[in-house]
C-alpha cells in the first residue's frame, strides 16, 4: 500500500480516504519518519476520524501523553458520541498519571446514550471506566447482560475478574438500575436457579418478571423459607444485589457454553469434600496447563 500511494502523493496532502489508509499503513509498518513527514505536510487542521486516531497513536508511541490528551479532546469535540475517542481520552489520561478526581470528571462527561447498548468500542471504553469508577462500569455491564444474557456472559465475567483487586470505593457514586434491583437464588425440584428480577421482561432461564406468579411469590418470601408453587416446592436460598446475581449467572452461562477453547473453569465444591476435595480438582485441572478461575 505504501509503495502504491507514494508516487501520486501531493506535496501538500489533504485528508482523504486514501491518505487515511496510507497513514495507517505507515503506522502499522513502523515507518514513523515518513508518517511524521506526512503529518507535518498535512498540518492544515482538517483531520478525518481515522487520521486523528493515527495521530493519537503516534503520540503514545512517543510517550507524549499530553499531546495524546489534546488530540483526544479535539477528537471528542468533533465526534462526541464516539466510544472509541472517549476511550482514547481515558487511555491518555491514565498514561499521563492524571489525578484520579480529574479522570473521574472525564468519566462523568461521557454521554450515557453511547453506552446504553453493547458495542465492542463501548466494551473497551467500559474496561477503562472501571479503573476509576468500577460501580459505573458494573452497572452498564449489567444492563447489557439483561438485554442479552448468553451473548454478554463472557464479557461480564471478564470485567469482573479483571477488576478483582480494584477498589470498589474509588467513588461513592451509586448507579441503581431502573429495571432490576435484586436477584434470587432458589431451589425447585432439586435444581438451583439464580435469576434477576427484571421489570417488564420475558421470563427466561436467567430473568424473572416481578409480576409473574413466581416473581411475586419469591418477592414475598424470606431467606430459608419454603413455599408451594404449583405442584412443586421452592425454597429461597439467597437474595442478592442485582450486579452480584448478574455475575453469578454469567459464570454459569460461560461454563455451560464453553466449547473447549475457553480457558475458563467453574469448580463446584461440596462442603463434605472440604479443602482436600478442592485441591484434588485444582490439581487435576492444573495438569492441563490452562488458566483456572476459582469460583466460590
Regions found by a protein language model. Name each.
Residues 27, 60, 94-95, 129:
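Hydrophobic/aromatic side-chain positions at a characteristic register within alpha-helices
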Residues 11-20, 44-53, 78-87, 114-122, ...:
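Generic helix N-cap/helix-start motif at coil->alpha-helix transitions
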Residues 21-22, 54-58, 88-91, 123-128:
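Structural register within alpha-helical repeat arrays
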Residues 149-193:
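Extended boundary segments
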Residues 202-215:
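Short, structured beta-strand/loop micro-motifs enriched in basic residues and often containing a Trp
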Residues 1-10, 31-44, 65-77, 99-112, ...:
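Alpha-helical repeat scaffolds
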Residues 177, 218-221, 227:
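Short, well-ordered loop/turn sites that connect or cap secondary structure elements
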Amino acid at each position: 500500500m505504501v509503495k502504491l500511494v507514494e508516487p501520486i502523493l501531493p506535496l501538500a496532502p489533504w485528508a482523504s480516504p486514501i491518505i487515511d489508509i496510507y497513514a495507517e499503513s505507515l503506522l502499522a509498518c513502523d515507518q514513523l519518519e515518513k508518517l511524521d513527514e506526512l503529518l507535518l505536510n498535512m498540518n492544515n487542521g482538517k483531520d478525518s476520524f481515522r487520521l486523528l486516531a493515527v495521530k493519537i497513536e503516534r503520540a503514545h508511541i512517543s510517550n507524549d501523553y499530553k499531546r495524546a490528551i489534546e488530540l483526544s479532546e479535539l477528537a471528542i469535540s468533533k465526534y462526541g458520541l464516539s466510544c472509541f475517542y472517549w476511550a482514547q481520552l481515558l487511555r491518555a489520561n491514565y498514561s499521563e498519571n492524571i489525578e484520579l478526581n480529574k479522570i473521574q470528571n472525564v468519566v462523568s462527561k461521557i454521554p450515557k446514550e453511547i453506552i446504553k447498548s453493547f458495542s465492542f468500542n463501548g466494551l473497551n471504553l467500559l474496561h477503562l471506566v472501571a479503573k476509576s469508577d468500577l460501580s459505573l462500569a458494573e452497572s452498564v455491564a449489567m444492563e447489557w447482560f439483561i438485554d442479552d444474557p448468553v451473548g454478554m456472559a463472557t464479557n461480564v465475567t471478564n470485567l469482573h475478574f479483571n477488576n478483582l483487586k480494584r477498589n470498589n470505593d474509588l467513588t461513592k457514586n451509586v448507579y441503581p438500575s431502573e429495571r432490576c434491583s435484586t436477584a434470587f437464588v432458589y431451589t425447585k425440584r432439586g435444581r438451583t436457579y439464580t435469576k434477576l428480577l427484571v421489570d417488564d421482561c420475558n421470563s427466561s432461564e436467567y430473568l424473572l418478571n416481578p409480576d409473574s406468579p413466581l416473581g411475586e411469590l419469591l418477592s414475598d418470601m424470606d431467606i430459608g423459607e419454603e413455599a408451594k408453587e404449583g405442584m412443586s416446592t421452592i425454597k429461597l436460598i439467597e437474595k442478592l444485589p442485582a450486579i452480584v446475581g448478574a455475575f453469578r449467572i454469567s459464570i454459569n452461562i460461560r461454563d455451560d457454553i464453553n466449547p473447549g477453547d475457553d480457558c475458563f473453569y467453574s469448580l463446584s465444591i461440596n462442603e463434605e469434600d472440604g479443602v482436600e476435595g478442592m485441591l484434588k480438582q485444582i490439581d487435576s485441572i492444573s495438569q492441563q496447563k490452562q488458566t483456572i478461575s476459582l469460583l466460590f
